[in-house]
Amino acid sequence: MGSILSRRIAGVEDIDIQANSAYRYPPKSAGNYFASHFFMGGEKFDTPHPEGYLFGENMDLNFLGSRPVQFPYVTPAPHEPVKTLRSLVNIRKDSLRLVRYKDDTDSPTEDGEKPRVLYSLEFTFDADARVAITIYCQAVEEFVNGMTVYSCKNPSLQSETVHYKRGVSQQFSLPSFKIDFSEWKDDELNFDLDRGVFPVVIQAVVDEGDVVEVTGHAHVLLAAFEKHVDGSFSVKPLKQKQIVDRVSYLLQEIYGIENKNNQETKPSDDENSDNSSECVVCLSDLRDTLILPCRHLCLCTSCADTLRYQANNCPICRLPFRALLQIRAVRKKPGALSPISFSPVLAQSVDHDEHSNSDSVPPGYEPISLLEALNGLRAVSPAIPSAPLYEEITYSGISDGLSQASCPLAGLDRIIENGIQKGKTQSKSPDSTLRSPSSPIHEEDEEKLSEDPEAPLPPSGVELVLQESSSPESFGTEEVGEPSLKQGSRVPSIDDVLQDGSPQHHGCSQPVPPADIYLPALGPESCSVGIEE
């Protein structure tokens, strides 16, 4: 399902719970709501901004409840300042919606009465265990023996409890429980801060019997209603809470970490749209640093270090930030015969002096991209058309005056020559339409390629990739204006030596598979050429 990071502090906190001791922001009486420091990753940090919530708006703290709770803290391990909590249930808040019922027989009205407007709630959820889901309307929250308990002012505002087995993408629908908004006041549609009344609460409690490990686990979705000018209603999610080991955690979104692979592909004319996982500053390294309190995951480690000393605004929303949080994902190293499976373990890195890949990586694990750990391997977009296949012919003279190291295709020419030397000059093939119109091939050039039959064949399964040549001259292209050229008249360009990539082999007992060269979209200063056999 997911992982939640929490800090563990040694000792037991004793709080005197009184009826009139209510926490809310802003506080009714004068005094400090926050301390002068905070703990993260097992280290203590001073608060540069007084009375500031580090992970969001200060008003978000009102969703945690107005009364303090008493619970013990587990003594942390010396080498594990951060504990990973497992989330067994997750309600997809974006899937929450209202379904209206228009059956007049179910909503009779008398003269002078308001017409009844009946709605029901539907949503999608994931569960790694058996769960029991209950809906509460106009409910207040209380903690009893470490468990979150919700109560409604009217029993008719509480639905029956529905039990589900474990599964992913399960649909919740309960037509028997209908919400009649004709009986609601306008101020009851929104969250009442003074009385602590939530318009609607969806509670999913793990129901695994006497299993001690999951006792007290629950997921809570808080939502409100909106009334439109046409008289219709809609539901708006407010916050989500996760109760793990009888401790309530407020969930906050991280912007820029969503799974873009599962979204529908929409054509866009904006090529610079933010649809990748690279850092928004350098556009090369992967994002792994979170900006607080705006919660934008948009920076890599090196750019985050630069931003700490040169600016104090988020590059996305331009709001001032108070902390930078690096989130690192690791996975277990696969065995020799075991398939690769993603088992992300999130770890925070607060050391800004060392950023090597081996920092804070447990033994037996290897660091991976955070987005790949949560969303899986990134698939190639099907909207990108495949480039035509070409074969390249060896040539000489183009790198006169240049060293061997400045010609990245030098080691590539021998392999390509070996794959083509068996071919003979042939007439126009059916797939000759793939031939570039600006690259005429001469018969004498093709005859010279077949003069060396003793060269060894390329090994099977060879795959070579060349990345970003240091000498753009070796990749320069020229337009050929004349239909034919005399051999030796001038140095041929790379366009002059491209030909069709499907030669037929004759006079060979075992046919050799052709070498395919795919050419992606080439920029003016760099080139990426791959050979796959």
Curated annotation (Swiss-Prot):
A motif (Required for TSG101-binding) lies at residues 385-388. Pathway: Protein modification; protein ubiquitination. It is an enzyme of class 2 (transferase). One of its GO terms (cellular component) is early endosome. Residues 443-454 have a biased composition (Acidic residues). Its EC number is 2.3.2.27. It is found in: Cytoplasm, Cytosol; Cell membrane; Early endosome. A lipid is attached at G2 (N-myristoyl glycine). The modification Phosphotyrosine is found at Y390. Keywords: Cell membrane, Cytoplasm, Endosome, Lipoprotein, Membrane, Metal-binding, Myristate, Phosphoprotein, Transferase, Ubl conjugation, Ubl conjugation pathway, Zinc, Zinc-finger. A zinc finger (RING-type) spans 278-317. GO terms for biological process: endosome to lysosome transport; heart development; negative regulation of adenylate cyclase-activating G protein-coupled receptor signaling pathway; negative regulation of G protein-coupled receptor signaling pathway; negative regulation of smoothened signaling pathway; protein monoubiquitination; protein polyubiquitination; protein ubiquitination. The keyword Metal-binding applies. One of its GO terms (molecular function) is ubiquitin-protein transferase activity. It catalyses: S-ubiquitinyl-[E2 ubiquitin-conjugating enzyme]-L-cysteine + [acceptor protein]-L-lysine = [E2 ubiquitin-conjugating enzyme]-L-cysteine + N(6)-ubiquitinyl-[acceptor protein]-L-lysine. Autoubiquitinated in vitro. Interacts with MC1R and MC4R. Interacts with TSG101. Interacts with mislocalized cytosolically exposed PRNP; this interaction alters MGRN1 subcellular location and causes lysosomal enlargement. This is E3 ubiquitin-protein ligase MGRN1. It comes from Rattus norvegicus.
